[in-house]
Amino acid sequence: ILDNEKKVFWQHSGLSLDLRIDRVDQLGDGSLALIDYKTGKFTNYKWFDERPDDLQLPLYQIALSTGTDQPVSATLIFQLNAENIGLISPMELSDFGAQIKVSRQAKSFEGGWPALQNYWNKSIHKLVEEFESGLVAVAPTRGATTCQYCDLGPLCRIAESEQSEIPLSEEDI
């Protein structure tokens, strides 16, 4: 264990983020592994979509990579609850052996760890640029499932966008 509760800063264009990584380990080859502890119910993390739902590990990876000379060669979730104790990773990791559960989406991702880092970096930069340009499209990536776990219901405009899809009658014109 190299660090616990590691504070990292990341900035891209006009967006600045102060982040805190639960744990950073130094591996045998000198590279870093970042670990995020989760005590809630297990979820299927969405790290590979065009607009990834789960940005915490990708953001930690880009921030830690930017703030150190040591390469980041692994990102992991340490799931710790009454139902499950174990490590989850977006990629196969030879340094950790069979004790790691690999994301189901990893099977459809072409490329190794460097390709995933590049993909995450591009995805995050694109999202930041959209945010800064004022793009505020109401477009939940998983429809009702996304909305089910969202805490921003009172502020959301999803109902407005659903109403706009209702065809107008001649009386409305």
What function would you assign to each model-found segment?
Residues I1-I173:
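RecB-family 4Fe-4S metal-dependent nuclease core
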